Amino acid sequence: MSKDQSYVLKAWEVTVRKTQQAKKRANSVFGTVSVAPHTDNDTTTDDNDDETTTNRSSLEEFYHAERVLPNGDYYTGQWYDSFPHGHGKYLWTDGCMYIGDWYNGKTMGNGKFGWPSGATYEGEFKSGYMDGIGTYTGPSGDAYKGQWVMNLKHGHGVKSFANGDAYDGEWRRGLQEGQGKYQWSDGSYYIGEWKNGTICGKGSFVWTNGNRYDGFWDEGFPRGNGTFKWDNGSFYVGHWSKDPEEMNGTYYPSGNEGNLEWDPKDLFNNLSEYTICSGERVPTLPSQKKLSVWNSSKRIEKPRRTSVDGRVSVGVDRAFEKMNMWGNEIGEGGADMRKELDAELMRLDAEGLQSLKSSPVPMKLPKAGRKQGETISKGHRNYELMLNLQLGIRHSVGRQAPAASLDLKPSAFDPKDKIWRRFPREGTKYTPPHQSTEFKWKDYCPLVFRSLRKLFKVDPADYMLSICGNDALRELSSPGKSGSFFYLTNDDRYMIKTMKKSETKVLLGMLAAYYNHVRAFENSLVIRFFGLHCVKLNGPTQKKVRFVIMGNLFCSKYSVHRRFDLKGSSLGRTTDKPESEIDSNTILKDLDLNFIFRLQKAWYQEFIRQIDKDCEFLEQERIMDYSLLVGIHFREASVAGELIPSGARTPIGESEEESGPRLSRAEVDELLSDPSRWASIRLGTNMPARAERTMRKNDSELQLVGEPTGEFYEVVMIFGIIDILQDYDISKKLEHAYKSIQYDPSSISAVDPRQYSRRFRDFIFKVFTDDN
């Protein structure tokens, strides 16, 4: 596949010479070619709709073609059904060139793209995207070799910069994220965690003179607990920040040397000289190129077709004459443009270090749990189900359809509004070939969920990348109480839950009311649904697996140190794990709660209003057994991992009278009073608050909410209402009747929806209060 640069230049000279001839012959090229239009009958519910579509003409053939196109572009290579298909070479008149594999007019397989500047990409392509393993070499010497997903660096990759710097590590959506090592040209290097292309999290910076810093970082600078070590063995331990008033720590000399006259600010000044190179930008992206094959005035415009692996270029022009082969790079205004995170709002992003004990004092950061879930790789019992799911999602989301409207007709909510599609292994006109077993795919109320994704501001390309990218899904270790299985996308943004038929009926029955509710209340706390689907496996059992795609509430830049599932009932509402097994992933319950949460006044009023509205909606739909899922990130901790109460002082050196910086309560209040800076937070997401510790009385009377102690902690909160698909059916009525004989009826979860709503609100309004 690989061609040297001289070959590219020679080929370009050929096409330039032919360009002038092409302009004279433009009217004759493809003059007799026509293609009948076709439509994708996706709205049918017939299981055999694929078999009824028109097959390609038997007169069409696979042959080698060499053509100068109407605009002067040049193509030579294999040709089939009016498309480049097989191996071929395409040259644009501006100097760009592609040599490689094609499939139905799209780059698919291995290939090489060259720019007139001398820049090249050589590697794998998929459905027109740079996707797989590939190497990009810039004209000035920048080079990246590694994994790509839908035109973005995504996965593991190594990038060398023209100035001599180099990065080896993980990438996500075009930026460094995860674990990685960046080495500067002078030999100094950083190894540790990255976020959104910057040093963020836990890591170490090592200078060539032997000095090093180990600790936490934010936006490329030390922030939080850390240790600076000199090569002679001396070290400085403390809390680091760009704000001098927040800096505090202790110097520990080596041997008998005295105190060092050293200003920690010198470290920040030194680090300012070490910048992360952004690398070269491609002046003309391949996404800006078009193929002139479809640019004939005598051809009938065809609608977009689904690509061979199920993807569709999202956001491209619908006309094939403007069809792009690549999506926009991040940073070019594409859908994957990252919004600036709210780093100024929160002071720390400390990772969980120690286990939170139930002993009175001191409270500690909980033990950090492992990344949740088992990666579904080849050989996993649900590997083929995952492949089927991903193929179906690509088809559903990428399918050509009118622009989603928020004003829907009642017929869109009809439970009978569903689309069946067969996915044979060899592929069809509308589905790609695949290696999984044959299956059928069903979309429930597709127009409604397309509108919901638009309402929730979910970009289709980003949605597909999260669920259908190269990274596999993760299956949670154990099924839920309902027997459902849960799957997480690798970026933690979406959760997929298998559904019982009864739950599917409940969701479809309440879908119209749910849609109107979340549209009317932008800050609704009810869980967000993005799609409802079914996979029918081929075989004698004809097994059906229904599943719903939801937002993952705890997808946040902040580590969730504590998780609570709150219902307002007491029977069985405590964790049955021993304390030694409780970590940051453990979901605690009502009787485990030892905090009252205090929200800033404006947010508290909005919280009260929204809880009332959401509960009224659920009560009207006869839903019960839902809960408020709460996640807490503690913002302040000592070097030893002990939580620092709000207003507490941190010792410096050996003097107990010296005090460290005050916590940022006033700053948070000031920030919240500035509406222009509210964009980074919304109700239930990344909310600053104070958590007041509570203690339950040691007597026989059960206390659902403990007594406040006056001990406050600065926290970041994430919360939302989950499990909203359980109606008060006959099984729940029987459960209530049976348990009422044995226990206090008010302590049981299974109660009438009206009573459940009232009890739930009473409890939540005791746990959440105004921070006055």
Swiss-Prot record:
CDD domains: PIPKc_AtPIP5K_like. It catalyses: a 1,2-diacyl-sn-glycero-3-phospho-(1D-myo-inositol 4-phosphate) + ATP = a 1,2-diacyl-sn-glycero-3-phospho-(1D-myo-inositol-4,5-bisphosphate) + ADP + H(+). One of its GO terms (molecular function) is 1-phosphatidylinositol-4-phosphate 5-kinase activity. MORN repeats lie at residues 75-97, 98-120, 121-143, 144-166, 167-189, 190-212, 213-235, 236-257. GO terms for cellular component: apical plasma membrane; cytosol; pollen tube. InterPro entries: MORN, PIno-4-P-5_kinase_pln, PInositol-4-P-4/5-kinase_C_sf, PInositol-4-P-4/5-kinase_core, PInositol-4-P-5-kinase_N, PInositol-4/5-P-5/4-kinase. Residues 728-749 are annotated as: Activation loop. One of its GO terms (biological process) is phosphatidylinositol metabolic process. The keyword Oxidoreductase does not apply. Residues 22-56, 646-665 are annotated as: Disordered. It is an enzyme of class 2 (transferase). Keywords: ATP-binding, Kinase, Nucleotide-binding, Repeat, Transferase. Residues 43-52 have a biased composition (Acidic residues). The keyword Kinase applies. Residues 377-768 form the PIPK domain. Its EC number is 2.7.1.68. This is Phosphatidylinositol 4-phosphate 5-kinase 5. It comes from Arabidopsis thaliana.
